[in-house]
Amino acid sequence: MASLICGSIAYDTIMNFEGKFADQILPEQIHILNVAFLVPTMRREFGGCAGNIAYNLNLLGGDPIIMATVGGDAAPYMSRLEQLKIDASHIRQIDQAFTAQAMITTDQANNQITAFHPGAMGESHLNQVSAVVAERSKNAKGPAKLGIVAPDGRQGMWEHCHQLAEAGIPFIFDPGQGLPMFNGPELLELIDIASYLAVNDYEGEMLSQRTGLSLAKVAERVKALIVTKGAEGADVYVDGKVVAIPPVPAAKVVDPTGCGDAFRGGLLFGLENGMDWETTGRLASLMGSIKITHQGPQNHQPSKDQISAQFKTAFGFSF
């Protein structure tokens, strides 16, 4: 079964400042702030929610289809997806734009200053779910039977949710950092046409505030509500009960960037393969735990056999 992954493709440029921002910023002069930080180290990572989710689903042996927009600078990313054998045929290139990118500077106290340029992501609405449906109906691998709408351009997120619903494709609504772009009634409209909803605990609180509904009430509007809680695992609200998903202690904590996307890759694989929520949630939890031990969102490279072995070690049964 193929999964259509709607969301962002982005570059993350990460720089390290060998000092503390606080030593360079004078509070009494904040109104005329003009600072420059020398950053001796810099690296560029492949990122973006759609790219990260697809990467993790691919590790598990799933069949991700990415639907996203990139800029004229996307050649390295597209080459990488080709090497990984991830379906990138529905990634649209906007030549006059840059691929979305985050430029992150971290100081020695782990404070961060981030600049985000959405670039081509703002044109995500140009992509149409119907085009994927038409193409995959003729593809030997078969049609997309599951989807996810992850953070992307606002109009793209809105339209892709409605297009998936109209196509009869069950999907996860994963608003993430895009959640503040929607008001309460808009969020409820998207939730009501989604099959599943995935948020972290902070986003869950914001969702409750904006909609005026408790998470339990929100859960009544979807087949399942998944709330991730970082090192505390996750809760799955389903069939009027809450399934607690235990965390998988990480061997070491290196970088949390992309852990939520790794979790969602596990969710999609479990749903693709008809697993129960106890198993699906545990697999998703494990994927997040594996990711956090590596720098960057797409640098962990476990084999499917290694993932299976770690799952059995952690939970005492196989998926």
Short names for language-model regions:
Residues 159-245, 252:
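Conserved phosphate/ATP/ADP-binding segment of small-molecule kinases
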Residues 82-97:
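A glycine-rich helix N-cap at a beta->alpha junction
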Residues 8, 68-72, 106-108, 117, ...:
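Cofactor-binding loop segments of dinucleotide-utilizing enzymes, especially the Rossmann-like FAD-
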Residues 58, 165, 272:
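Gly/Ala-rich phosphate-binding loop of Rossmann-like dinucleotide-binding domains
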Residues 90-94, 102-151:
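Conserved phosphate-binding/catalytic loop of the ribokinase/pfkB sugar-kinase fold
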Residues 212-319:
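Conserved phosphate-binding/catalytic region of the ribokinase-like
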Residues 3, 63-64, 88, 171, ...:
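Hydrophobic anchor at the start of a short beta-strand
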Residues 1-65, 76, 319:
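Glycine-rich phosphate/adenosyl-contacting loop at the front of the ribokinase-like
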